Regions:
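A conserved catalytic-core segment of Leloir-type glycosyltransferases
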Residues: 41-117
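Donor nucleotide-sugar binding/catalytic pocket of nucleotide-sugar-dependent glycosyltransferases
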Residues: 143-154, 161-207, 217
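A short, well-ordered alpha-helix in the C-terminal region of glycosyltransferases
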Residues: 348, 355-370, 379
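Conserved acidic donor-binding segment of nucleotide-sugar-dependent glycosyltransferases
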Residues: 332-340, 348-353
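Short hydrophobic beta-strand element within catalytic cores of glycosyltransferases
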Residues: 313-317
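Aromatic "clamp/platform" in nucleotide-sugar-dependent glycosyltransferases that forms part
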Residues: 296
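Conserved donor-binding/catalytic core segment of Leloir-type glycosyltransferases
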Residues: 6, 214-232, 238-242
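Nucleotide-activated donor-binding/catalytic signature segment of Leloir-type glycosyltransferases, i.e.
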Residues: 258-282, 290
Length: 392
């Protein structure tokens, strides 16, 4: 009998977000093997959690999606709750007030999990930090599989999150680094777990010249893909780029792809291209010298994996524990610790294209050996079997 799997995630469908994209891709990959249903909110954006989708039963990519209204989005004075939860001498009540103020609070979603969660053999909860997971996991602990998408941030140190990491029947990690960090912090090795990851698919027809022609870019370019926002390290990226151009008088361009949530430098060597389709994104990757990624707190970066799968090196901050460690393991990335090192690494890649190709080839091999959908799906099926066996 096929497993019946419920996926609980804070947003689902045509929404921007790493965990949400991960969940949607996984659901599609599991469909041939399981009866999969999704429970989510009606929110489209993660900041306000404003109700944007229609509540009720929906279908996305042929999958039944139950959407429940957000009763409380992010509090207007959220920062006040955040400060209270992280100050010295705070209480557990302060921590739960922070979780509630962060949103999304969706009582009908939790009631669905409570009333119908045991109709499923496994319940996958995506992302540890939000209320649907914090309050949902304890409702079906014997069926819960947590996909924490965790990184070493202040919130994970709050006592209110301990039960989230100790209650599930199993945990599915994205990387070795995420697993090791969670085990160091929570000492929960006893819970069945695996480094499952996510699959990476790239087109064989990506064309860098097509991207250049479409956007009028000549000469070498470095690429950033993602939300252009302070929390992703973009101010540092822009400052480091200016330092690089001050010492490098060549024609290199920084191409920015994604939603802009902050000002972009008005420079002729910085091109903001806005959000692009997947096809255009892969064209951009095909033509770039390297991907630059400035985020520090990712549990996994899909764009880094996609760059490697396309045979491109990545330049990442040495202060990003997961990505810098993965870059070393893959032999496909160059971590920088300062603006000077950033500039030196970009110059190195421009001056030594053979090295860039070698790094990219190592990245392609790393992804092919680690992040393929057949392997990912089998690991999830094994976790489902583990949960099912323990509930007989």
């Amino acid at each position: 009998m096929a497993d019946r799997v419920l996926v609980v995630v804070q947003r689902y469908g045509d929404v921007a977000g790493g965990a949400e994209t991960h969940a949607r891709q996984l659901v599609q990959q599991l469909r041939p093997h399981c009866d999969v249903t999704v429970a989510t909110t009606t929110a489209r954006d993660y900041w306000t959690w404003e109700n944007a989708f229609v509540a009720g039963e929906d279908r996305v990519d042929g999958v039944v999606v139950h959407r429940f209204p957000v009763a409380q989005g992010r509090a207007p004075d959220f920062r006040r709750y955040e400060r209270a939860a992280f100050r010295a001498g705070h209480t557990l009540a302060d921590e739960h007030a922070f979780i509630d103020a962060q949103g999304p609070i969706a009582p009908e979603l939790l009631e669905f999990v409570h009333q119908r969660g045991r109709e499923y053999t496994s319940v996958l909860f995506f992302t540890y930090i939000y209320a649907p997971t914090v309050y949902g996991v304890p409702l079906v602990p014997e069926r819960a599989i947590l996909v924490p998408t965790a990184h070493d941030e202040p919130a994970i140190g709050l006592a209110a999150y301990r039960q989230v990491f100790h209650t599930p029947r199993a945990l599915a990690f994205n990387t070795v680094e995420e697993r090791d960090m969670v085990h160091r912090r929570f000492h929960n090795e006893r819970i069945p777990h695996d480094v499952v990851g996510v699959g990476v698919d790239v087109p064989a027809t990506a064309d860098g010249d097509r991207f250049r022609a479409a956007h009028g870019i000549t000469g070498p370019y470095f690429l950033y893909v993602g939300r252009i926002v302070e929390s992703k390290g973009c101010p540092e990226l822009f400052a480091h780029w200016a330092r690089f151009k001050a010492r490098h008088d060549g024609p290199a361009t920084l191409a920015l792809v994604g939603h802009r949530e902050m000002d972009v430098p008005e420079r002729s060597d910085v091109r903001y291209l806005g959000p692009l389709s997947d096809a255009e994104k892969f064209d951009a990757l095909a033509g770039c010298t390297a991907l630059t990624y400035s985020g520090l707190l990712d549990s996994l970066s899909m764009i880094v994996l996609e760059a490697w799968a396309m045979g491109k090196p990545v330049v990442v901050s040495s202060r990003a524990p997961v990505l810098s460690s993965m870059s070393r393991r893959a032999g496909a990335g160059l971590p920088y610790g300062s603006a000077t090192e950033f500039a030196e690494l970009l110059e190195l890649l421009l001056e030594r294209p053979t090295l860039a190709r070698q790094l990219g080839a190592a990245g392609r091999a790393f992804v092919a050996g680690t992040y393929t959908w057949p392997g990912v799906v089998q690991k999830y099926l094994d976790l489902f079997a583990e949960v099912r066996a323990r509930n007989v």
